[in-house]
Amino acid sequence: MTESAKQEGDVPAGARELLLQTASDIMREGDIVDISLSELSLRSGLNSALVKYYFGNKAGLMKALLDRDMAGIVQAVDALMAKDMPPEARLRRHIGAVVDTYFKTPYLNRLLMRLVRESDDDEAHRIADSYLTPLSRAYDKLIEDGVRQGVFRNVDPQLFYFTTTGAADRFFSSRLVLKHCYDTDTLTEELRDRYREHCIDFIMSGILATR
């Protein structure tokens, strides 16, 4: 597919974004970290050749999806950290946002680990420098601000990061456990809301300083 073909309108408007969102939907609904190009084409209504046109290959599509999802997270965290608000309120809002993120993209951590593992060193460092390091620094500041103001116990920000993200990732990537132990494999908004409230209460109880 040539550039002239694109200019002539052979490529539907918004096709790149539609391919990414359809891939996201397929992985979320199937609780998987892979897609078939035939299903992607069927679900999106687009020619699978557009994957090569926009992303080079399926691996490029998966990398672009990770970039889309992780860039959105970093931007949201940066915006939250820029707000003038008390550390406790900021952390409560962040924990809720983490739960919402993994409800929307339960494949995220598995996709991240897969791409880091399968990438060469340069690409793995790019992923870390672009997304993981900024998030780590945000957690450092988030916890340090609360400790300095006497609101939070002096916990390790690195371990707190894994506690918070791990709680959300584990729950929303455990559909088989929900199915076989609790007779449900549907991630409903009601379930998300219940788990969000649970995580906020549970995690905040562990970090708030005794008053």
Give, region by region, the residue ranges found by the protein language model.
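Hydrophobic alpha-helical connector segments
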Residues: 78-110, 157-164, 193-196
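C-terminal peripheral helix-coil segments that are non-catalytic and often amphipathic
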Residues: 2-4, 104, 133-149, 153, ...
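Short secondary-structure transition hinges
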Residues: 100-138, 159, 185-190
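Amphipathic alpha-helical linker/stalk segments
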Residues: 3-6, 65-93, 142-144
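Short coil/turn segments at alpha/beta junctions that flank glycine-rich nucleotide-binding fingerprints
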Residues: 29-33, 84, 105, 149
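Helix-turn-helix
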Residues: 18, 26-60, 64
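Generic hydrophobic, amphipathic alpha-helix propensity
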Residues: 15-23, 40, 65-69, 73, ...
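Short amphipathic alpha-helical elements of helix-turn-helix/winged-helix folds
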Residues: 22-26, 167
